[in-house]
Curated annotation (Swiss-Prot):
The gene is ALS7. Induction: Highly expressed in biofilms and during candidiasis infection dissemination. This is Agglutinin-like protein 7. Residues 1-18 form the signal peptide. It is found in: Cell membrane; Secreted, Cell wall. The lineage of its organism: Eukaryota, Fungi, Dikarya, Ascomycota, Saccharomycotina. It is a lipid-anchor; GPI-anchor. The GPI-anchor is attached to the protein in the endoplasmic reticulum and serves to target the protein to the cell surface. There, the glucosamine-inositol phospholipid moiety is cleaved off and the GPI-modified mannoprotein is covalently attached via its lipidless GPI glycan remnant to the 1,6-beta-glucan of the outer cell wall layer. The keyword Plastid does not apply. One of its GO terms (biological process) is hyphal growth. Disulfide bonds join 74-151, 97-113, 206-299, 228-257.
C-alpha cells in the first residue's frame, strides 16, 4: 500500500511540474502537393499535401513531461495510418506527437506533443518533420466544415500554422475543381479510422427554382450502415471553387433514413438555391462496395429531371508516412588570440552527419591593473599570456588634487569647468549654478480649520512662491439703529487670525401711541422699546373722564368729511351732540390692513373696528329727493393714482333723507396703493334740517348704518336708493353689548367675494342732476370721457368685484342709463385679476401669463376686467333708455373720443405694448396703427355723436370661458424686432372688435374654446350721423418654428375702399363683421360670433411659416454649408480615379453614364416622374474640356415657386447627351460625383407652396464619367464599321460623335452599346485641397450671401470647364521633380456670384509621357494608379509590370506602392479566362448594361514573384579557401488584388466590354 501511495505522489509531482512550452516548431519550410498513395475516389488530389516544418528542443528550456502543440487550421485530417510521430535525433526520440484530426467536428487539426525523458539540461537537438495532411474545403453541412469551406480559394493562398503565439506561414497554389458546378456534386471523405466516411450529395441546379424533388443515396452491402443521427440537410446559393457549399440555409423537407438508405423529399425551393444532404456511414473495409445516388427534381418551368449516379469503392487506400529527421546540436568553445568573441557553425550534412557543431571562439582573458604616480604622463604596460592563461594590462596614471569652487551665473543650467595645473598638480574645478529664485509669500484663506503652507518651486531664473493658507476668521454680528429709513449691512474683514465684524444697521422702530384710561387721577406715560424690526409702544394713561363718551348734534346741518391716510393703525372717532349748530365728524383711518370707520347720526357712541385682509368692495350711489328745486356742485378735480401695491377703496354714500329740503353732496373717490388722497365735500342744502351720513359696504366688514336704513325705509317710493349688499366672510364676529361703546369686530380671510347691485329709480319730473367730473389717470394710461369714468383698479394679490352706477341728467331732459359689470373669479386661483393700461415710449412689458380684456362703451361706462387661465370671466355692458330721453348737448360740439385698444399680453420672451388706435367721431375716419408687424391690434370703439331728439339703445355681451387647467396661453401679442422672429410655439390668438358697441380681445389656446358674441339693438329712433366703423380681422396663428406677423386690415365706414396694412404673409385672416351706417329713423341689429376649437392633444398644424433650407450631400460627405456663396473648395469625397489601357484596345462607351441619386433608390421604386430631366454635355477640344450639367430637384415642377402640389417619392427619368471631340493628345478621366439623401415624407402628407417647415423635398445628384477619346490619327481604322455611331464618328469633319441615351425605370435595361474607339494608355490622379461641401445657389442672395426667402431654388445649373494645355505639346512647361502636371480648374456658375467666387477646386493630372510610350506594345499592360486613400495623398507615377506574351492572360492590377528596389519577375499568373469568356458572351447576348446577376463582379488577380538568393559557403584550410557547399534560397511572394479596373486580353489584344463597364460601375458607386 505504501508503494502505491508513493507512486501516486510521484505521478502527482510529475504532473505538477510539467508545463506548456512554445517555440519548438520554428519554421514552415514548404507545402508540397502529393499525387501518390491515395484512392482514386477519395480526397481531391490537389488538397493532399506534405507539410515540412523545422523544430528544435533545448534542455535548458524544456523538461521531460512538458507539452507543446502545433495547431493547423483548415486541415481535415492526417493522411497516414499512424496515430503519432516521434521527433528523433540520432535515433533517440525526444518528443512524441499524437495526431488529432478535426474532420467534421472541429475546424482545425492539431499535433499534440510531449517531451520524453531523453531530453536533459545539457542536450540540444533540432530537426524537421514531414506531415501528410488533407485540407478541408467542404463536403458536409456541419458547422465546422461550412467554416473551413471559406478558408481558401483557387490560386495562391497563404497557409498558416500556430505554435503558441508563433505563426508559421508559407504559400501554396490551390487548383480549383469547377467541373461539377452545374451538375450533381458527390463527395466521400474517409476518417482516420478508415472504417467510416462522410457521404455528401448536392442536387443539380434548377436556375428557375425547384417545384419538388428527391435526393439521397443507398447501398445493398451488408456492412454498409448509415448513422441517422449525423444527418445534415440544407440549401445553399453559394459554392466555392471546389463546388462545395459555403452556407447552409434550413428549408422545409422530409427525411427518410434507414441503415442502408437516406432520402430527403422537398417542395418549393427558391431560384438560385440547391439542396444537399450528408451523413456519416460505416463502410466495409475488406471488399469493394457500391453506393447509388438518387437525384430527381422538377423545376419551376415544369421540366422533370432524374439523374441517377453510382460510385464504386475498390481496394483499401494507401497513405503516406509521417517522417521526422533530427540531429544533435553541440556547442563548443575555443580560445583564440584576439579581442572579440566570434561564433561559427561547422559544416553539416544532414543525411551523413548526426551532430551539428557550433564553435564559439573566445579571446584570451585579460585583467587590468591601474596605478598612480606623481608626474604628468600616463603609462601603459601589458603582460602577455598563452592560451589557457590570463593576460594583465597595467595602467599608471599621474596623481592630481582638485579644488572645487561654486559660483552663481545668469544661466538656468549648471556648468562645470576644470582647470588643470601641470606644475603644482592642483587642479581647479569651477561649478556654475543658477542664482536662487526669489520667493513671494502670500497669505490667503481656505476652507480648512488649520494653518498650512504650500511651496511652489520654479525652474532656475523663475520665482518661487509660498502660500500660507489660514482658516477663515470668526465673525461677530451686531445690530444697531441708525438715522436712515432703510436697513443696511456693513462687513469689516480683518487680517488672518483676526475677527471679522458684520454690523446690521436698522432704521428706528415705528412707534404706536395708545391712550388708556385708568383709575388714577393723574396722567402718566409708559414707553415699551423692542428690538430691530419691531414696533415700539407708548402707552398714555389718562384719568377716566365720563364726558368724552358722546356729543350731541344740535345743528340742523351736518357735514361728514372722510379722509384716508397712511400712518399708524389707530382709529379715532368723535361725534358732536345734536344740540350743536354745526359739527364735523372727522374719520382718520390708515393701515396696511384696510380699516374703515363710520360716522353715525346717533347720540350713542360706537366704535367699529374692521380687519380685512386684502379685499375690498366699493359701492357708490347718489340719490336726490323729489323736491322741485335744488342744485348740486361736485368736485371739479379728482386725481386718481395707481401703483403696483394693493389699493383699498373708500366708498362714501351721501343720503339726503330730510323731508323738508335737501341738498346734494358730491363725493370723490380716491384709489391709491398707499391710500393717500384727499376728499373734499361741498354740501349745499335748501333747509337747515339736513343730516349727512355715510354708508360703507365693504368686503372687509359687515355693517350698516341704522340711520341710513331708517331714512331709506321712510323715504318716498319714487326716490328710494336700494342698496343690496352681500358679503361672505368665513370668520366674522359681532359682539353686541348693552354698554357703550358698541364694538363690532370682523375678521375675514384673504379671499372673499362681494356682490353689490345698485339701482337708481327716479320718477319725479322736477329733479335735475348734473354731474361733470373730470378725471385724470396719471399711472399707466389715460381715458377721457364725456360721461362718468370709473378708474381701473390695479390689484395683484386680491380679488375684487366692483359695481358702479352713475345717474346723469341734463336740463329739461330725462335720461336713465345703467351699467353693470359682473366679474367672477375662482377663489382658489392665483391672483391674476387685474387691468393694466400703460403708455410708455418703449412699449415694453415684462408681464408673463396675463389675460386682460378691456371694454369701453362710448358715453356710458369704461371698465377693465382681466382673468387668467384659471378664471371664468363674463363682461356685460348694457345701455337702456327710457321712453323719453333727449340728449341735446351731452358733450361739446367738437368731441374727440379715443378708441381704446384691448391689450392682452402674455409673452414668452419679448412683449411690446399696443398703441391705441384713435378715431374721430366727427371725421369718421380711423387711423391705422403704423406698424409693419402687428398682433392683436384691436380698435374697440369709435365714439359717435348723437343729435337731438334721438334715442339709442345698445347692448353688448362678451363671454369668455377658459379652461382652468390649461397652460396660460390666452393672450394677444404684438412685437417688433429686426429679425421678425418669435420664439413662441403653438399659440392661438383671436381678436374681435365691434364698432360703436363693445370691443374686447378674447384669446384661447388649442385647449380652449372661445365664443364671442356681439349684439347691438336699437329702440324706435336711432340716428348715427358720423360713426367711424372699423372692420375687424380675427387672426389665428400657430407656428412650429418661425411665426410671421399678421396685420389687421381695417376699413372705414365713411370711405368705401378698405385700407389694408401691408403684410408679406398672412394666415387665417377672417373678417368678422363690418359695421354700417344707418340714417335717421332706422333700426339696426347686428351680431357676430366667433367659435374656435382646438384639439388639445394634437400637434398644431395651423401655422404660418416659410422655412427653406437647402443642403447638398457630396459623395459620402454631408456637412452644413460653410462659406455660403463663396465656394472655394471641392469636397474630399470625389474619388481618386486612375485607369490604365493599351493601344488597340476596345473602349466601350457604356462607360459614359449619368446617374441621378447615386443610390439609385428612385429607379428601384419603379415609378417615374416627368418633371425631372438631367443632361450632360462634354466637349473635348485640344485645350479644354467643357460640360454643362443641369438637374431639377425631384418632385418639382416649373411653377413659380418651384414646388409641386404634393410630396412624391418619385423615380427619375434621365436623358443624357455626350459630345466628344477627339484630339491627338494623351487624355484624362474626369470624375465628378454629387449625391444626396432621398426626400422625406412629412407627417401632414402634403407640402404647401411655401414648403411648410420642411426642407426641399429632394436634392439632385449627378455623376459624370467622361474619358477623353484620344490618340486617333488619319491612318487609324475603326472596328465595327457597321456601327452607325462609328460611321458618324468617322465621317464627321470635326471628329465629333454624339451619344444620347434615355432611361426610364431601371437604368441598366436601356443602356446601349456604342462602338469602340481607339485610345492610348494614360493615367490620371487627383489632389484635392479641402473637404468642404458645396452649397446650391439661389436666384437672389442677401448681404450675407445666403439665399433670400423669395429665391427660386427649384433648379440649379452647373458648368464644368477644364482649362489646360495640350499634354503632348506643351507639357514641358509644367514639369517638376515628380512628373508632368497640367492644372484643371472646375468652375461652377450660378446667378448672384461673381466670377472670382466660382473657382472651387484645382485638380492636378500627372503622368510620365516617356514611361507610357516605352511600355505600350501588344503584349504588355500598364498598371493603373491606385485610388487615393486620404485627401492629399500624392500618388506615385505608374510603374508597369511586364507579363510574358506566353501568359494565360494579360491583366492590369492595382499595385499599392510596391517595393521598387526588388527585381520583380512574374513567376505565374492565374486567371479564369473561361469565366470571363462566359461573362463577355453573356454580355454580348443581352442588350443590357450589366449582364446576368450571377456574374462575379469582383475578379481577383494573383501575382507571384520569385526571388533567388544564392550563397556559396567556403572554408579556409591552410590559408586556401575551399568551397564547401552552395545554398540556394527561393522566395515566393504571392499578392492577390481585387482591381478597380481589369482589362482581360485575348490573343488579338481586344478588351472586354464587361471589364470597362465594370470599371465604370465601381467608380460610380465608390466601391473602392
Amino acid at each position: 500500500m505504501k508503494k502505491l501511495y508513493l507512486l501516486y505522489l510521484l505521478a502527482s509531482f510529475t504532473t505538477v511540474i510539467s508545463k506548456e512550452v512554445t517555440g519548438v516548431f520554428n519554421q514552415f519550410n514548404s507545402l508540397i502537393w502529393s499525387y501518390t498513395y491515395r484512392a482514386r475516389y477519395e480526397e481531391i488530389s490537389t488538397l493532399t499535401a506534405k507539410a515540412q516544418l523545422e523544430w528544435a528542443l533545448d534542455g535548458t528550456i524544456a523538461s521531460p513531461g512538458d507539452t507543446f502543440t502545433l495547431v493547423m487550421p483548415c486541415v481535415y485530417k492526417f493522411m497516414t495510418y499512424e496515430t503519432s510521430v516521434q521527433l528523433t535525433a540520432n535515433s533517440i526520440a525526444y518528443a512524441t506527437c499524437d495526431f488529432d484530426a478535426g474532420e467534421d467536428t472541429k475546424s482545425f487539426s492539431s499535433l499534440k506533443c510531449t517531451v520524453t525523458d531523453e531530453l536533459t539540461e545539457d542536450t540540444s537537438v533540432f530537426g524537421s518533420v514531414i506531415l501528410p495532411i488533407a485540407f478541408n474545403v467542404g463536403g458536409s453541412g456541419s458547422k465546422s466544415t461550412i467554416t473551413d469551406s471559406k478558408c481558401f480559394s483557387s490560386g495562391y493562398n497563404t497557409v498558416t500554422f500556430f505554435d503558441g503565439n508563433n505563426q508559421l506561414s508559407t504559400t501554396a497554389n490551390f487548383l480549383p475543381r469547377r467541373e461539377l458546378a452545374f451538375g450533381l456534386v458527390v463527395s466521400q471523405r474517409l476518417s482516420m479510422s478508415l472504417d467510416t466516411m462522410t457521404n455528401f450529395v448536392m442536387s443539380t441546379p434548377c436556375f428557375m427554382g425547384y417545384q419538388s424533388g428527391k435526393l439521397g443515396f443507398t447501398s445493398n452491402d451488408d456492412d454498409f450502415e448509415i448513422d441517422c443521427s449525423s444527418i445534415h440537410v440544407g440549401i445553399t446559393n453559394e459554392i466555392n471553387d471546389w463546388s462545395m457549399p459555403v452556407s447552409s440555409v434550413p428549408f422545409d423537407h422530409t427525411i427518410r433514413c434507414t441503415s442502408r438508405a437516406l432520402y430527403i423529399e422537398f417542395k418549393t425551393i427558391p431560384a438560385g438555391y440547391r439542396p444537399f444532404v450528408d451523413a456519416i456511414v460505416q463502410i466495409p473495409t475488406t471488399e469493394p462496395f457500391f453506393v447509388k445516388y438518387t437525384n430527381e427534381f422538377a423545376c419551376v418551368n415544369g421540366i422533370y429531371t432524374s439523374i441517377p449516379f453510382t460510385s464504386f469503392f475498390s481496394q483499401p487506400i494507401l497513405y503516406d508516412e509521417a517522417l521526422a529527421i533530427g540531429a544533435d546540436l553541440v556547442r563548443t568553445t575555443s580560445t583564440v588570440i584576439g579581442s572579440i568573441t566570434r561564433t561559427t557553425t561547422l559544416p553539416f550534412i544532414s543525411r551523413l552527419q548526426k551532430t551539428k557543431t557550433i564553435l564559439v571562439l573566445e579571446p584570451i582573458p585579460t585583467t587590468t591593473v591601474t596605478t598612480s604616480h606623481h608626474g604628468f604622463d600616463t603609462w601603459y604596460y601589458t603582460k602577455k599570456a598563452t592560451i589557457g592563461d590570463t593576460a594583465t594590462v597595467f595602467i599608471d596614471v599621474p596623481q592630481h588634487t582638485a579644488t572645487t569652487l561654486t559660483t552663481y551665473w545668469q544661466e538656468s543650467s549648471t556648468a562645470t569647468t576644470t582647470y588643470f595645473d601641470d606644475i603644482d598638480l592642483v587642479d581647479t574645478v569651477i561649478v556654475k549654478i543658477p542664482y536662487p529664485n526669489p520667493t513671494i509669500i502670500t497669505t490667503q484663506f481656505w476652507s480648512g480649520k488649520y494653518l498650512t503652507t504650500e511651496t511652489h518651486k520654479e525652474p532656475p531664473l523663475g520665482t518661487d512662491s509660498v502660500i500660507i493658507k489660514e482658516p477663515h476668521n470668526p465673525t461677530v454680528t451686531t445690530t444697531e439703529f441708525w438715522s436712515e429709513s432703510f436697513a443696511t449691512t456693513e462687513t469689516i474683514t480683518n487680517n488672518p487670525e483676526g475677527t471679522d465684524s458684520v454690523i446690521i444697521k436698522e432704521p428706528h422702530n415705528p412707534t404706536v401711541t395708545t391712550t388708556k384710561f385708568w383709575s388714577e387721577s393723574f396722567a402718566t406715560t409708559e414707553t415699551i422699546t423692542t428690538g430691530p424690526l419691531g414696533t415700539d409702544s407708548i402707552v398714555i394713561h389718562d384719568p377716566l373722564e365720563e364726558s368724552s363718551s358722546s356729543t350731541a348734534i344740535e345743528s340742523s346741518d351736518s357735514n361728514i368729511s372722510s379722509s384716508a391716510q397712511d400712518s399708524s393703525s389707530s382709529v379715532e372717532q368723535s361725534f358732536t351732540s345734536a344740540d350743536e349748530t354745526s359739527s364735523i365728524v372727522e374719520l382718520s383711518s390708515s393701515s396696511d390692513i384696510p380699516s374703515s370707520s363710520i360716522g353715525l347720526t346717533s347720540s350713542e357712541s360706537s366704535t367699529v373696528s374692521s380687519y380685512d385682509s386684502y379685499s375690498s368692495s366699493t359701492s357708490e350711489s347718489s340719490i336726490a329727493s323729489s323736491y322741485d328745486s335744488y342744485s348740486s356742485s361736485s368736485i371739479e378735480s379728482s386725481t386718481l393714482s395707481s401703483s403696483d401695491r394693493y389699493s383699498s377703496s373708500i366708498s362714501d354714500t351721501t343720503s339726503f333723507w330730510d323731508s323738508s329740503s335737501s341738498d346734494l353732496e358730491s363725493t370723490s373717490i380716491t384709489w391709491s396703493s398707499s391710500i393717500d388722497a384727499q376728499s373734499s365735500h361741498l354740501v349745499q342744502s335748501v333747509s337747515n334740517s339736513i343730516s349727512t351720513s355715510q354708508e360703507i359696504s365693504s368686503s372687509s366688514s359687515e355693517e350698516s348704518s341704522t340711520s341710513a336704513t331708517d331714512a331709506l325705509v321712510s323715504s318716498d317710493a319714487s326716490s328710494i336708493l336700494s342698496s343690496d349688499t352681500s358679503s361672505y366672510y368665513p370668520s366674522s364676529t359681532i359682539s353686541p353689548s348693552d354698554d357703550f361703546p358698541h364694538t363690532i369686530a370682523g375678521e375675514s380671510d384673504s379671499q372673499s367675494f362681494s356682490f353689490i347691485t345698485s339701482t337708481v329709480e327716479i320718477s319725479s319730473d322736477s329733479v335735475s342732476l348734473t354731474s361733470d367730473p373730470a378725471s385724470s389717470f396719471d399711472s399707466s394710461s389715460r381715458l377721457n370721457s364725456d360721461s362718468s369714468s370709473s378708474p381701473s383698479t390695479d390689484q395683484r394679490d386680491i380679488l375684487t368685484s366692483s359695481s358702479f352706477s352713475t345717474l346723469i341728467k341734463s336740463s329739461e331732459s330725462r335720461e336713465s342709463s345703467s351699467g353693470t359689470i359682473l366679474s367672477e373669479e375662482s377663489s382658489d386661483s392665483i391672483p391674476t385679476t387685474f387691468s393694466t393700461r400703460y403708455w410708455s415710449p418703449s412699449g415694453m412689458s415684462s408681464r408673463h401669463y396675463t389675460n386682460s380684456t378691456e371694454t369701453s362703451v362710448s358715453d356710458v361706462v369704461s371698465s377693465s376686467v382681466a382673468g387668467d387661465e384659471t378664471s371664468e370671466s363674463s363682461v356685460s355692458v348694457t345701455s337702456e333708455s327710457s321712453e323719453s330721453v333727449t340728449s341735446e348737448s351731452v358733450a361739446s360740439e367738437s368731441v374727440t373720443s379715443e378708441s381704446v385698444t384691448a391689450v392682452s399680453d402674455i409673452s414668452d420672451l419679448y412683449t411690446t405694448s399696443e398703441e391705441v388706435s384713435t378715431s374721430d367721431s366727427n371725421s369718421g375716419m380711423s387711423s391705422p396703427i403704423p406698424s409693419s408687424e402687428q398682433r392683436s391690434s384691436i380698435p374697440i370703439m369709435s365714439s359717435s355723436d348723437e343729435s337731438s331728439e334721438s334715442r339709442e339703445s345698445s347692448i353688448g355681451t362678451i363671454l369668455s370661458e377658459e379652461s382652468s387647467d390649461s397652460i396660460p396661453t390666452t393672450f394677444s401679442t404684438r412685437y417688433w424686432s429686426p429679425s421678425g422672429m418669435s420664439s413662441r410655439h403653438y399659440t392661438n390668438s383671436t381678436e374681435t372688435s365691434v364698432s360703436d358697441v363693445v370691443s374686447s380681445s378674447v384669446a384661447g389656446d388649442e385647449t380652449s374654446e372661445s365664443s364671442v358674441s356681439v349684439i347691438s339693438e336699437s329702440s324706435e329712433s336711432v340716428t348715427s350721423e358720423s360713426v367711424a366703423s372699423e372692420s375687424v380681422t380675427a387672426v389665428s396663428d400657430i407656428s412650429d418654428l418661425y411665426t410671421t406677423s399678421e396685420v389687421v386690415s381695417t376699413s372705414d365706414s365713411k370711405i368705401v375702399p378698405s385700407t389694408s396694412v401691408p403684410s408679406s404673409e398672412q394666415r387665417s385672416s377672417i373678417p368678422i363683421m363690418s359695421s354700417s351706417d344707418e340714417s335717421s329713423e332706422s333700426r339696426e341689429s347686428s351680431s357676430g360670433t366667433i367659435l374656435s376649437e382646438e384639439n388639445s392633444d394634437s400637434i398644431p398644424t395651423t401655422f404660418s411659416t416659410r422655412y427653406v433650407s437647402v443642403s447638398l450631400t457630396v459623395g459620402e460627405l454631408s456637412a452644413l454649408p460653410s462659406l455660403p456663396g463663396k465656394l472655394s473648395h471641392l469636397p474630399s469625397s470625389l474619388s481618386e480615379t486612375s485607369i490604365g489601357m493599351t493601344k488597340s484596345a476596345n473602349l466601350s462607351p457604356q462607360f459614359f453614364s449619368t446617374s441621378v441619386d447615386s443610390a439609385l433608390s428612385y429607379w428601384a421604386s419603379g415609378s417615374s416622374s416627368a418633371d425631372h430631366q438631367s443632361s450632360a454635355t462634354c466637349d473635348v477640344s485640344e485645350s479644354s474640356v467643357e460640360g454643362n450639367l443641369s438637374a431639377m430637384a425631384l418632385g418639382m415642377s416649373n411653377s413659380d415657386d418651384g414646388l409641386s402640389e404634393d410630396t412624391r417619392s418619385s423615380s427619375v427619368a434621365g436623358k443624357e447627351e455626350i459630345e466628344l471631340t477627339s484630339t491627338n493628345s494623351v487624355g484624362e478621366i474626369t470624375l465628378i460625383s454629387y449625391s444626396s439623401s432621398s426626400p422625406t415624407t412629412h407627417d401632414h402628407g402634403r407640402v404647401s407652396k411655401s414648403m411648410g417647415a420642411a426642407p426641399l423635398s429632394s436634392l439632385f445628384s449627378v455623376s459624370v464619367h467622361a474619358p477623353l477619346v484620344t490618340g486617333l490619327s488619319d491612318s487609324d481604322t475603326f472596328p465595327s464599321e457597321n456601327s452607325n455611331r462609328s460611321r458618324s464618328f468617322k465621317e464627321s469633319t470635326d471628329n465629333t460623335i454624339s451619344i444620347s441615351r434615355e432611361s426610364l425605370g431601371n437604368p441598366y435595361s436601356s443602356i446601349s452599346s456604342p462602338s469602340d474607339y481607339d485610345v492610348k494608355s494614360f493615367t490620371t490622379s487627383r489632389e484635392l485641397v479641402s473637404s468642404e461641401s458645396i452649397l446650391p445657389f439661389s436666384d437672389v442672395m442677401d448681404a450675407n450671401d445666403m439665399p433670400t426667402s423669395g429665391s427660386n431654388l427649384h433648379s440649379m445649373v452647373f458648368s464644368i470647364s477644364v482649362l489646360g494645355e495640350k499634354f503632348n505639346a506643351n507639357i514641358e512647361k509644367h514639369k517638376n521633380t515628380n512628373g508632368h502636371y497640367s492644372s484643371m480648374v472646375f468652375t461652377y456658375q450660378s446667378a448672384g456670384l461673381e466670377e472670382s467666387d466660382q473657382r472651387i477646386a484645382v485638380t492636378n493630372t500627372k503622368f510620365d509621357q516617356n514611361k507610357i510610350d516605352t511600355t505600350i506594345d501588344s503584349n504588355t499592360f500598364v498598371t493603373s494608379l491606385p485610388f487615393a486613400t486620404t485627401l492629399n495623398d500624392q500618388i506615385d507615377q505608374a510603374v508597369p509590370i511586364k507579363i510574358p506574351a506566353s501568359s494565360t492572360a494579360g491583366f492590369v492590377s492595382d499595385v499599392l506602392k510596391p517595393d521598387y528596389s526588388k527585381s520583380v519577375q512574374a513567376e505565374s499568373v492565374q486567371t479564369d479566362s473561361t469565366t470571363y469568356s462566359e461573362m463577355m458572351s453573356s454580355k454580348r447576348n443581352k442588350n443590357s448594361g450589366f449582364g446576368t446577376s450571377s456574374l462575379n463582379l469582383k475578379p481577383t488577380i494573383t501575382v507571384v514573384t520569385k526571388s533567388i538568393d544564392t550563397k556559396v559557403n567556403t572554408m579556409k584550410e591552410g590559408g586556401v579557401s575551399k568551397q564547401v557547399s552552395t545554398t540556394v534560397t527561393e522566395q515566393y511572394d504571392t499578392s492577390t488584388y481585387t482591381p478597380a479596373s481589369l482589362l482581360v486580353s485575348d490573343n488579338s489584344g481586344s478588351v472586354s466590354k464587361y471589364s470597362l463597364w465594370m470599371m465604370a460601375f465601381y467608380m460610380l458607386f465608390g466601391l473602392f
